Amino acid sequence: MPPLKRVKRANPYDLYRTCKRWKCPLMSFLKVEGKTVADKYCSMGSMGVYWRLALHGSGRPTQGGYVPLRGGGSSTSLSSRGSGSSTSISRPFAGGIPLETLETVGAFRPGIIEEVAPTLEGVLPDAPAVVTPEAVPVDQGLSGLDVAREVTQESLITFLQPEGPDDIAVLELRPTEHDQTHLISTSTHPNPLFHAPIQQSSIIAETSGSENIFVGGGGVGSTTGEEIELTLFGQPKTSTPEGPINRGRGIFNWFNRTYYTQVPVEDPDEIAAAGSYVFENALYDSKAYKHEQQPWLSRPQDAPEFDFQDAVRLLQGPSGRVGWSRIIRPTSIGTRSGVRVGPLYHLRQSFSTIDEPETIELIPSTVDEEEVLTGVPESAEGPDAEYSDIDLQSIGSDEPLLGTGIIYPLVGGGQIFLCMHRAPVGWSSGTYINHEGQSRDDGEYVIDNGGQSNITPTVVIDGSIALSLEYFRHYYLHPSLLRRKRKRNPIFI
């Protein structure tokens, strides 16, 4: 059995050319020549549409009808239907009203009557239409007719001569043409969005507007308007929300201990550097070039160890006014389907946590009361007391100079007021020395003039000793104790 094969059908136009000499089905000829029933219906329909549109657009081919009057007042009009059309006369009124009576009818515009006048030769076209002769011939038939001509010529420049000594010459100029009138129009459009300030009566000595001046929160002068009482928002005074927070359930609740391991941290951002390495850039670190100071640069260094540095996924939680949370999943075993096996950690930093107060031991600060000691040390007690001879070259001595007790500095001068105070940390102690001239019983007069005295001071301790809070220091160096400077002569070689 031969295989079934689809044979392509021939084109009707090819069959028409082939069957022109042979007998072929009639349908092929009609289709190619366009003589089928469908072609006939289409031709007849298109013909009807064409004639319908042609007759409708041409209008009614009749004459007559009312034609309005033209500007010339003529009743004869030429129709504009074509160059070969005939002239038609239109009658505006069927009753045959004569044309002369149209001027007396107020409902119609009077026609323009063109007067036929003889053409005057020799008259310029710019000459006036009415010509007045210089002399009018006297005619007996024209009695009572007087023709007069008034010639008035205005001077353009008028010079007024001064008549008296007080007069001033005035030169009056008139324009050559008529006065030029300028038309000026003004239109005013009110703006509903703008309101001019209303000047109100101000108080005495007020020179500025009272609408925009505020002193101390109040308006100066009389103010108008509606007073609106403001509400003070004093609550809440804390950043913690008052109402409960709608938390998720199951794995969406980060505080669920079934799915997450709660880890309180101080700063969750420290774990953001997980998986990064720390190295030094030699371009910005000058010490990196000195290998003798940093021998460890030759070998690789490990990254610093952070908590949860093996986190491969960070989820930033809702940052509210209470705390800050992060969810991390450390590296663990995973399958091809994407399932990860491992714990989830919830890192939480609470902002509203109040820590326990730290106990700080305070150092007591005490100030001694003023204490006045009346009396003198034993070594200077009385005029008959024996003085100890002390070698000035000696550095130390077995016996105390002033006995036991308070140590007083040796100050040369007369009566001494020694002020000492045991001050706490942060205070400074000082001495106040009152230098006064003193006359002793043996006739010796001690002059205390500070560093300007030429007398070598002696070690004299006398008078009362007062302890007070006086902070003054007066130090004088006697000129005899100064080192003399040797003048050096320059040596020229």
Swiss-Prot record:
Q: Which UniProt keywords apply?
A: Capsid protein, Cytoplasmic inwards viral transport, Disulfide bond, DNA-binding, Host endosome, Host Golgi apparatus, Host nucleus, Host-virus interaction, Late protein, Microtubular inwards viral transport, Phosphoprotein, Viral penetration into host nucleus, Virion, Virus entry into host cell
Name of the gene: L2
One Pfam family this sequence matches:
Late_protein_L2
Q: Which family does it belong to?
A: Belongs to the papillomaviridae L2 protein family.
Q: Where is the composition biased (Low complexity)?
A: 75-88
- Example GO molecular function: structural molecule activity
Task: Fill in the subunit field for this protein.
Answer: Interacts with major capsid protein L1. Interacts with E2; this interaction inhibits E2 transcriptional activity but not the DNA replication function E2. Interacts with host GADD45GIP1. Interacts with host HSPA8; this interaction is required for L2 nuclear translocation. Interacts with host importins KPNB2 and KPNB3. Forms a complex with importin alpha2-beta1 heterodimers via interaction with the importin alpha2 adapter. Interacts with host DYNLT1; this interaction is essential for virus intracellular transport during entry.
Tell me the segments the record calls region Disordered: 64-89
> In UniProt terms, what function does this protein have?
Minor protein of the capsid that localizes along the inner surface of the virion, within the central cavities beneath the L1 pentamers. Plays a role in capsid stabilization through interaction with the major capsid protein L1. Once the virion enters the host cell, L2 escorts the genomic DNA into the nucleus by promoting escape from the endosomal compartments and traffic through the host Golgi network.
Q: Where is this motif: Nuclear localization signal?
A: 1-10, 483-489
Span-the-membrane segments of this chain are: none
Question: In the UniProt record, does the keyword Membrane occur?
Answer: no
InterPro entries, A to Z? Late_L2 (IPR000784)
What post-translational modification information does the record give? Highly phosphorylated.
What is any one of the record's Gene Ontology cellular component terms? host cell
Q: What is this protein called?
A: Minor capsid protein L2
Q: Name one GO biological process term.
A: symbiont entry into host cell
Cystine residue pairs: C19-C24
Q: Where in the cell is it found?
A: Virion; Host nucleus; Host early endosome; Host Golgi apparatus
